[in-house]
Each structure stands twice: as C-alpha cells, then as structure tokens.
C-alpha cells in the first residue's frame, strides 16, 4: 500500500481548506486522505475518515466526544486522534493539520506522539504566539495562517499552498533516521554552560561523578567548565 499524508482538521468548519490542501498535495504528486475531527456530526461526505470513525478510537468509544461541551470534546477527540494515527503509523508519510485555538489544541498532542522525523506541519492561527505547549519535545513545524481559517481567500490559499508544498518536499525527499543501536545521552545548555557541552569534551562530562544539571550549572564559574576543572566544579554541590 502506498503511504499517504494525513490532512486533519474539523470538516464542519474548515472543509474548504481541507479539500484545498488535498488538491495542492495531489498537484505535487503526493497521496493524501482527509481526517475529520469535528466534534459535531453534520454528515459531510468529502472527507475520507469521518469524525465518528475517528472518535470510535477513544477507549470509551465515540459518545464522550460528542458530549456537547466544547473544551471537553476537543480533549477527548485528541485522545482518539492519537490512537488512530498511531494505529496507522506504518501507512502514514506525514501529517498536516489546520486549526484555530481549539483545532490546534486538539491536533498537536496527537502529532507529538508520532516519531521524530515523520513530517508534521500545523497550520494554525496560534502560530504567531507562544507555541511551546503545541510543540513540546517534538519536531512539529508551526505555520501561521495570517488570516482566520473561515473560508478560502487569496491569503489563506497562498498559506495553505505553501504548507502543502512544504509537506510534499518533506515526503518526496524524506531522509530516515539512521538505525544506530547505541545508548543515547541527552544534554542541554543555557548561555554560560554552552562551552561545556560540545563534541570535544563530551567524554570528560561522562567522567564526572556527579551529574550537573542545566539549572545547577548556572552557579558554576564558566572558567571551571572551559578549563575542565571538574573536581572543583563537583565541590560546589
């Protein structure tokens, strides 16, 4: 089976935008399916997976999704979408979502659950602000809509076309992660700690008896790190 891009959004409010994205992907030579995550059932027929079908992936079934309480419904649908995407992960080449505040809050947690390297683009009205809650420790690319997503216009067509072409490029020139079975060490850095975290002295860090966290290392004099004075640094703790 050919892998496809998942185009996800609420078809009850953004069907035109979803269909536009699908058409743009088709023009770029990429197969895609539309996944509806509406929390109301309006019986539209243009999407490949209707909201009821996605909602049934929730552990408690579809009923909690269509509870009529907006903030609860998007939280529950997000859980269902997460399960749905992960159950189909072998067939998915990428995920592109569109949404306002509610749609972004619903779609991005599901994206976060997907493997690093799988292309993920969120076209959102929220992308011009603090996006940390939407991205977290994932590789989601956020693209600002400029306008509200409430029907197609010359600006939204341009933004959505760019998003589709970004996804097409990511899919057509996809580079898989190297399959290296080695232990992985994660280090972080902040300002004055940067000189201590690089490839040239990483082995020295592994030799330190005590772990110096990012927060605690802020009280270590930079010269101790630069001069690799690990014993002196350890005495601070």
Report residues per predicted region:
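Cap/lid and interdomain-hinge subdomains that line or gate substrate/regulatory clefts
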Residues: 62, 66, 130-192
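N-terminal phosphate-binding or glycine-rich loops at protein starts, especially the Walker A/P-loop
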Residues: 2-42, 94, 104-120, 124
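Short, acidic/small-residue loops that bind anionic groups at enzyme active sites
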Residues: 106-135, 144, 213-218
């Amino acid at each position: 089976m050919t892998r496809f891009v998942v185009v996800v959004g609420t078809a009850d409010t953004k069907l035109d935008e979803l269909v536009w994205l699908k058409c743009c992907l088709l023009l770029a030579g990429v197969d895609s399916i539309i996944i509806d995550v509406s929390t109301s059932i309006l019986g539209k027929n243009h999407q490949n997976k209707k909201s009821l079908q996605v909602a049934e992936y929730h552990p408690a079934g579809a009923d909690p999704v269509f509870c009529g309480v907006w903030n609860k419904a998007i939280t529950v649908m997000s859980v269902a979408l997460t399960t749905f995407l992960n159950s189909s992960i072998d067939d998915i080449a990428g995920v592109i979502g569109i949404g306002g505040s509610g749609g972004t809050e619903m779609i991005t947690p599901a994206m976060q659950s997907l493997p690093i390297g799988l292309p993920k683009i969120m076209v959102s009205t929220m992308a011009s602000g603090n996006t940390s809650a939407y991205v977290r420790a994932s590789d989601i690319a956020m693209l600002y809509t400029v306008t509200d997503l409430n029907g197609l216009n010359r600006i939204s067509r341009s933004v959505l076309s760019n998003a589709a072409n970004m996804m097409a490029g990511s899919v057509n020139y996809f580079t898989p992660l190297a399959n290296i079975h080695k232990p992985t060490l994660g280090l972080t850095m902040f300002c004055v700690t940067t000189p201590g975290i690089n490839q040239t002295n990483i082995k020295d860090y592994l030799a330190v008896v005590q772990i110096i966290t990012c927060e605690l290392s802020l009280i270590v004099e930079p010269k101790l790190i630069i001069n690799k004075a690990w014993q002196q640094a350890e005495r601070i703790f």
